[in-house]
């Protein structure tokens, strides 16, 4: 049971860091559009 809880905690930490990185990329995508790259790339 403890391993399952640890796995959930690790997945949760990875998920939140991925979401925050994704939002940072979306905020910076305006700069990429100026450089000719499509939004969300």
UniProtKB/Swiss-Prot annotation:
The record marks 35-36 as: Cleavage. Keywords: Latency-replication decision, Secreted, Signal. Residues 1-21 form the signal peptide. GO terms for biological process: latency-replication decision. GO terms for cellular component: extracellular region. NCBIfam families: AimP_fam (NF033802). This is Protein AimP. It comes from Bacillus phage SPbeta. The gene is aimP.
